[in-house]
C-alpha cells in the first residue's frame, strides 16, 4: 500500500493516515498468516501490535481523549479507516472493532457514571468483550419496532424473557446490551415507541443460554449466536437511559455503525483493486499478460470508478455528520451503494485471480462474503432505498428541491 499526503487535507489528518499506513504495511499485513491461524502463536503478535498502536496515539479513533481514544471526528476517521481497513485484522488491533465500538458509543451517550466505570472502561481497555443482542428469529430484523423480547420490572430488578439470534461476538462477550420492550403491544405505525429499553446483561446471568452459533456462509464455528433469555434477572440500574430511549439509542448506534462499515469497505475494496491490477500485470495467459486483455482492462476501469464513487460518497457523508447536518439520506445512500460496489470490485478481482481467488490463500473470498453480508447487516438495501426516496419526496412536497451541494 502506497500512501501519499492528500493536498488540501489538514497536516494532522494526513499524519494520522500516514502513521496508520506504516503500521498496517510493516506490522499487520506481514503477520496476517499468523493472525489468521490464531491460537497461542498469534497472541503475542496481537499484543505487540496493540501496544505499538497505543504508543503512536492511534488507539480507538472513535472515542474521546478522556476515555483513551483519539477524539477525531467522522471525516478524519473516514480518511484513517480507508487505510486501516486494508487488513481484516486491523480494526481489533486499533481498538475499533464491532460490536464493541458501537456498544462503547452507546455507553458513552446513555450510560451513567457508574455504568461507564463498570462496563465502558474495561471494554475500552480490552479487559472485557461485549455483544449487541437485538435481532430476533421471529421478527424482521429491519423493523426494530417489532421486537418482542420483554423486560418486566419486579422490585429492583428487570426480568427478561425473549429469543435473539445473530448476536455477534456472543461467545467472547462478558456482557450483552439487550434490546427489550416493557409492554406487550407494539405501538401503531408512525407513533413514538416509548416502551423500548436497552439493558446490560452479564453473559453468566442465570437464564441466559447460548443455544448455538448460527452457520453463516457454510461456517459452523462462527460467533453469530442464537440466545434465549428465560427469566433473566438483572438490577434495574442496568438499564441504559430511560425506558423509551431504546429505539433512539439503537438508531444512534446503527447510524454510526453503517458509516463505519462503509469506511471499512473502502479500504478492503482498495486492497482488492490493488491485488487485481498486480495480478493482471504478472499473469501470463494465451501468449500475453492479463493486463493486455480488454475484458480485464474493463474490470480495472469499472473498479476504479466504483471505488472513487464509493469513497467520495462516504467522505461527503462523514463531512455532513461532522458539521452536524442531517445525514440520514446520505447514510442510507452509502449503505446501499458502498457494499454493492465492494461486492462488484471483489467479484472482478476474484475473476482475475481465477481459482486462486476463491481459495483461502488470498483475502478475496472473505471479502466477498463480507461484502454480500453488508447488504443485509444494519438494514437491507431495500429499506434504505425506500428511506432515500421518502426523504427526497418529503423535501419536494414541502416546496423545496434537492441541493446536492449541501
PLM feature spans:
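Short Gly/Pro-enriched turn/cap motifs at secondary-structure boundaries
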Residues: 123, 138-142, 166-169, 188-191, ...
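Flexible, small-/acidic-enriched active-site or ligand-binding loops
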Residues: 146, 204-233
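Flexible, glycine-rich active-site loops centered on histidine and acidic residues
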Residues: 104-110, 133, 185
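Short, conserved phosphate-binding/catalytic loop or strand-edge motifs used
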Residues: 97-104
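Glycine-rich phosphate/pyrophosphate-binding beta-alpha loops
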Residues: 140, 165-171, 219, 256-260, ...
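A short, Trp-centered hydrophobic/proline-enriched beta-strand micro-motif
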Residues: 126-135, 179
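Alpha-helical interface subdomain recognition
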Residues: 1-90, 97, 110-115, 122-127, ...
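A short core secondary-structure module
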Residues: 148, 156-157, 161-210
